Amino acid sequence: TALNAQDIAGPSCAPAFSMSRADFLMIRQLMEEKNENGNRVPELSVEFDADTEVIKDQYTYNIVGKIPGTDSDSMILLSAHYDSYFEGFQDDNAAVAMIIGIVRALLRGGYKPRHTIVVCALAAEEWGISDTKYDWSTGAYRQVFEARPEWQGHVIADLNFELPAHAHSTRDAVRCTYEYADFVRSFVDAVQMPEGIYPE
């Protein structure tokens, strides 16, 4: 976990800082140190030195792979974004690795899908566009409406994965559009949780 300035949904000129867990731990240790009288230091000064620049109208690339289905007219997307702040393991490269792992398991198992399975590693999720609260959707939106307009009307579902390696809770969340709510509830109810999936 880190102090993260992502998705500020504001102007590109707004000052924003991110702090790693390692830096937080160092600052906390300094705050817990005691002076010669045995008292904690009441105040700690920290200097932020940030030089950031948002360069607009740059190119990003979505990476796509397919397993052809017997019904070539319909597709199921497995998607995750690969752009990130700092290392990006949790947000969201773990999800990219996961969808690649899903497809690899299907191929190794000889599975022949009915619907074409499309793997999408998307860019422009963290900051796809300035001055809007929908900056996170730019890469996915442009994939369907600009890069692959022929997909419209053929994608029956997009299973998008975000933060799959989160280890600080005893439950996951599934979100969907209201049209899929009944289906998703029945799907979730049918899933059996393996033992030890949420370690203490």
Indicate residue ranges for each PLM-predicted region.
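Soluble metallo-hydrolase cores and metallopeptidase-like ectodomains found primarily
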Residues: A5-Q90, G101-Y111
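Metal-dependent peptidase/peptidase-like ectodomains
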Residues: A16, F24-L25, S72-D73, L122-E200
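Phosphate/oxyanion-binding active-site loops and adjacent basic polyanion-contact surfaces
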Residues: K56-Q58, A95, W136
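Extended, hydrophobic alpha-helical segments in both membrane/secreted and soluble proteins
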Residues: I76-L78, Y82, Q90-L106, H115-E126, ...
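Active/binding-pocket-proximal capping segment
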Residues: S84, I117, C176-Y180
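Short helix-capping segments at alpha-helix termini
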Residues: G110-K112, E150-W151
